[in-house]
Amino acid sequence: ILYNKYQPFLSLSKYYGYLSLLLIVFVITQIFYEKKWINTLVKVLVVLAGVLFILHTLGLISRWYISGNAPWSNAYESIIYVAWSIMLFGLTIGRKSSLTLTAATFLTAITLASAHLNWLDPEIANLMPVLNSWWLLVHVSIIVASYGPLFLSMILGLLSLFLIIFTTKKNKKKMDINIKEL
């Protein structure tokens, strides 16, 4: 009943969205201005991203507990699982680059928001008989999770291209460092 009342993934999509907007503003500001308070604020936002990831994980665990099977039995569950894998890889890879975590947070927000479109049913359903095999379940989970790093690498590639476009003689040194981080 609490799960249905709070709708954790709809709330998380909003929180990831707000956090990604803040990260975009302050990480881009951090590239051009080296201020201590901006660095501290970015670190706080990174911690908030970790907290949201923990809540995302708890939401997946609660879906697993309620349904009695792994949460990738329909399109809605697959999308929220892909969003989880995007954030997992974003946090893992983004330890050294706040731009990577910013891109992961933005992409996670978009992915979770797309899971709540009208054509997807968030109902907790029974596992499809074809997925009843343990080996097939592991195979599907790995294949579906692999979309996370694929989407993240696409966004990071686009971000690198934008940084290259906006590189001038004045900011070449800083931009080269950020491009190498990505």
Regions found by a protein language model. Give the residues of each.
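Polytopic transmembrane helical bundles with strong interfacial aromatic enrichment
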Residues: 1-182
